[in-house]
Amino acid sequence: MQSINLTDHFLIAMPGLEDSFFARTLTYICEHSERGALGLVVNRPTDLSVENLLLQLGMFPKGTASSNLPVLLGGPVQIDSGFVLHEPVGSWKFTLSSNESIGLTSSADILQAVADCEGPKRMLIALGYSGWAAGQLEQELAQNAWLTVPAESQILFELSSEERLPAAMKLLGIDFCNLSSEVGHA
């Protein structure tokens, strides 16, 4: 099988995907290699706001720029841990660069910077992440569980969580309502 790298791509869940957690999700792939893949679901908001998350962590927001943003449920792995997808990459303690401008940070220094109004210009904060073991994502792709498309930062950072999946589908020229898990023959 030919090696593919889906870092900085969107995964769009197909209607037939059997995992209920990922039904109707848009996942941003932060890293994909022969060791596996790591991503964040970017269209599953929680009831928790960034402001409330910061307060729960003992950080007192000095401004309101991002305080009303919803915290996302990034995936079923480590749901008690926070992950910040942001632009620009910056120089935070634990950052994984997905491309030249987008990073994923898991250290508390970025959250303190957000509370101090010194955080990244554009960001999403998620609890948990989505992970795949070596070869697992490739197997799911072969089973038609996902559509893939190169990611666009405008979709991540300028649209609401509800608008992200339809916008990613539009990149492929597809309306989600027209997708089916059934195959027919003429």
Swiss-Prot record:
Recorded GO CC terms: cytosol
Organism domain of life: Bacteria
One matching Pfam family: DUF179
Similarity section: Belongs to the UPF0301 (AlgH) family.
NCBIfam families registered for this protein in UniProt: PRK00228.1-1
Protein name according to UniProt: UPF0301 protein NE1668
Biological source species: Nitrosomonas europaea (strain ATCC 19718 / CIP 103999 / KCTC 2705 / NBRC 14298)
